[in-house]
């Protein structure tokens, strides 16, 4: 049984190597036809466009001012004074401050927390 398995393995290996040589020789002789991409027209419109810089930054991205952060309650938090600034979560007061000073990315409305309301 082991001998039969070894013989079949050897025959298969010889077959694989001989078929690779046929394909390689045909490729080198340019006998193979080029493969046409069927979906080439479909993806022609999906070519990547040049990326434009956003006017605001998401949480964690580097920015220099509160007005550069996207969310209404986002604030620009800087370490060591003015270095390593990034957008982090702020509060209602942050939103009011942005509403007064920002000309771009100005908040339309400031969300109020439901924690301070009395129930009952």
From Swiss-Prot:
<protein>
    <recommendedName>
        <fullName>U13-lycotoxin-Ls1c</fullName>
    </recommendedName>
</protein>
<feature type="disulfide bond">
    <location>
        <begin position="56"/>
        <end position="70"/>
    </location>
</feature>
<feature type="disulfide bond">
    <location>
        <begin position="69"/>
        <end position="87"/>
    </location>
</feature>
<dbReference type="GO" id="GO:0005576">
    <property type="term" value="C:extracellular region"/>
</dbReference>
<dbReference type="GO" id="GO:0090729">
    <property type="term" value="F:toxin activity"/>
</dbReference>
<keyword id="KW-0732">Signal</keyword>
<comment type="similarity">
    <text>Belongs to the neurotoxin 05 (agouti) family.</text>
</comment>
<feature type="signal peptide">
    <location>
        <begin position="1"/>
        <end position="16"/>
    </location>
</feature>
<keyword id="KW-0964">Secreted</keyword>
<keyword id="KW-1015">Disulfide bond</keyword>
<feature type="propeptide">
    <location>
        <begin position="17"/>
        <end position="54"/>
    </location>
</feature>
<feature type="disulfide bond">
    <location>
        <begin position="78"/>
        <end position="85"/>
    </location>
</feature>
<keyword id="KW-0800">Toxin</keyword>
<feature type="domain" description="Agouti">
    <location>
        <begin position="56"/>
        <end position="95"/>
    </location>
</feature>
């Amino acid at each position: 049984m082991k001998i039969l398995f070894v013989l079949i393995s050897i025959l298969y290996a010889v077959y694989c190597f001989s078929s690779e040589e046929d394909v390689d020789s045909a490729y080198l002789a340019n006998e193979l036809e080029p493969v046409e991409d069927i979906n080439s027209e479909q993806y022609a419109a999906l070519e990547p466009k040049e990326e434009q810089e956003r006017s605001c930054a998401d949480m964690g991205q580097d920015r220099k001012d509160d007005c550069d952060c996207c969310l209404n309650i986002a604030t620009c938090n800087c370490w060591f004074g003015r270095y390593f600034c990034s957008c982090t979560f702020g509060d209602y007061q942050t939103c009011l401050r942005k509403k007064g000073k920002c000309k771009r990315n100005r908040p339309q409305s400031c969300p109020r927390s439901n924690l301070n309301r009395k129930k009952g």
